[in-house]
C-alpha cells in the first residue's frame, strides 16, 4: 500500500510518486513478490478527483517499468461509474483493481453478487474485493460472507478478496474459498490467514523498508509461522509508541 504524496499546495507530487515506486521495485518488490497498490484508503483514494487518480496511476505504472504489478483502488461508486473507472484504469496499465463494497447502498448479498459480476463482465483485469464491513450500516448483514464469495466463482475476473470479518463472525470461514480465490489478510492476522490457505497481506511499511515485509512474506510462504510472527512483533513493538501518538493526533 503506497501513500499518495502531495506538495505544499496539496497537489499530487508525481516526482515523489515515481521515486517511491522505483525505490521499492529496486529493493525487490517485483512480480511474484507483491503488488503495488495505489489510490487505496491509505493512499487517499476516496479523496482523489477523477482528474488526479489517472495521472497518479500512469506515473506508478511508468515507474514500475514492467517489473512489478500495479493495481488501483476504486471507492464506493455506483456500478456504472465503477465500470467506467475500471476500464480507464485497465487502459492505463493497471493489472488489477481493489473495489470497495457498495456500502453506500446498504447492499444485501444478492446485490454484492450483481455488483461485482457486472464489473467483471466488462473488464479484462483482476478484481480484489475490499471487504469494508466497518463502513456498513449493518456489518454482519452487508459484508461479503463466505457463501457469497463462493457464488462469485464464475465471475471470471474476481480473483481475490481482502479478508476481514465483523465482530462475532468467523474469520476461518475463508477456508471454504481459499482454494478458489486469492485471500489477502486485512485484519493483522497474517499467520492465521496463511494457515487457512491465504496468500498475502496488506502492509503500509513497504514504502519505508521493503526488505522487512519481503522477508516476512518468504517466511509465511514457507510455513515458518513462528519466525514470521516474531519479526512482525519486533517491528510492531518498535513502532507502538509512535503509532499511539500518531493516532492521538489524527485518527
PLM feature spans:
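Short, charged/polar low-complexity linear motifs in solvent-exposed/disordered segments
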Residues: 30-32, 89, 220, 245-248
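Active-site beta->alpha loop and helix N-cap motifs at the rims of alpha/beta catalytic domains
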Residues: 2-143, 149
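Catalytic alpha/beta core domains of metabolic enzymes, predominantly
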Residues: 122, 132-247
Amino acid at each position: 500500500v503506497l501513500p499518495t504524496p502531495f506538495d505544499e499546495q496539496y497537489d499530487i507530487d508525481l516526482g515523489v510518486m515515481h521515486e517511491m515506486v522505483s525505490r521499492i521495485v529496486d529493493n525487490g518488490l517485483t512480480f511474484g513478490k507483491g503488488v503495488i497498490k495505489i489510490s487505496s484508503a491509505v493512499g487517499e483514494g476516496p479523496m482523489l478527483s477523477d482528474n488526479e487518480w489517472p495521472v497518479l496511476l500512469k506515473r506508478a505504472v511508468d515507474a514500475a517499468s514492467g517489473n512489478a504489478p500495479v493495481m488501483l483502488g476504486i471507492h464506493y461508486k455506483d456500478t456504472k461509474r465503477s465500470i467506467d473507472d475500471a476500464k480507464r484504469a485497465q487502459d492505463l496499465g493497471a493489472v488489477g483493481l481493489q473495489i470497495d463494497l457498495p456500502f453506500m447502498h446498504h447492499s444485501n448479498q444478492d446485490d454484492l453478487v450483481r455488483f461485482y459480476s457486472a464489473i467483471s463482465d466488462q473488464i479484462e483485469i483482476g478484481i480484489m474485493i475490499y471487504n469494508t464491513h466497518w463502513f456498513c450500516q449493518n456489518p454482519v448483514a452487508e459484508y461479503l460472507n463466505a457463501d457469497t464469495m463462493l457464488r462469485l466463482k464464475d465471475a471470471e475476473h474476481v480473483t481475490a478478496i481482502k479478508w476481514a470479518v465483523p465482530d462475532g463472525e468467523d474469520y476461518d470461514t475463508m477456508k471454504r474459498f481459499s482454494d478458489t480465490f486469492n485471500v489477502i489478510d486485512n485484519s493483522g492476522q497474517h499467520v492465521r490467514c496463511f494457515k487457512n490457505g491465504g496468500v498475502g497481506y496488506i502492509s503500509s511499511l513497504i514504502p519505508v523498508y521493503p526488505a522487512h515485509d519481503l522477508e516476512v512474506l518468504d517466511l509465511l510462504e514457507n510455513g515458518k509461522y513462528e519466525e514470521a510472527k516474531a519479526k512482525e512483533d519486533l517491528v510492531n513493538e518498535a513502532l507502538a509508541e509512535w503509532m499511539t501518538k500518531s493516532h492521538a493526533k489524527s485518527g
